[in-house]
Amino acid sequence: MFVLREVAAQFERPAILFSGGKDSIVVTHLAAKAFAPARIPMPLVHIDTGHNFPETIEFRDALAERLGVQLIVGSVQDTIDGGRVREETGAQASRNRLQIATLLETIENGKYDACIGGARRDEEKARAKERFFSHRDDFGQWDPKNQRPELWNLFNGKHMPGENFRVFPLNNWTELDIWNYITREQIALPSLYYAHQRMCVVRDGVILAHSEYLPQREGETPEMMQIRFRTLGDLTITGAIESDANTLEKITAEVAATRVTER
């Protein structure tokens, strides 16, 4: 929570990048505690690709209303319609990469100088180099050689006009830490994280939710499976796992026993 308070103290226009996944939900929960009894003093920024799970969008809207926090939505479809990016086609088509342009536009339009995210170092190799305060230049680029020291939990948020920071309060948390915290605090999550029945296709060894956004390959047959999601993103790229974990306690035990990362 001290990282969130440090952001509020050092930056003029901070925002929380909210994906609707468990990590951004935990960040938002921590922000609510950090600034209580006041409201969260920064908006939630969500980049809507148009290919999100409906459950994610419903949860996002309900959470913003319950907390009384401003919700800013950047639309990938608007970016496509404006001719600033081109829609991908084919069986591997995804809007995952396209959302980068929408995010940068949203940051620029909102003049946000600090964007708080839920990324963790244990998720993938690229994120292992991230600091708590991660500097971005005026083109939105990250240079690992141009990061500030963070000795003794001292953070340097100084930046030139047009530059900004990504801030990662959960940088040193693990997936198990996240679930232990969610279980302890009894934090509400989208139903997608719990075991449920869903029509799926298995593609290249990955279980994907069957949807109108997922072009079906020849020979693929959707089948009903009992699955849950460890991480949430677009319908077209978010892989599921077969599971019967339908409570927080079962999910936490499942995560503790797994030897495969969520990404």
Feature names for model-found ranges:
Residues M1-R263:
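Nucleotide-activated chemistry modules centered on ATP-dependent adenylation/adenylyltransferase
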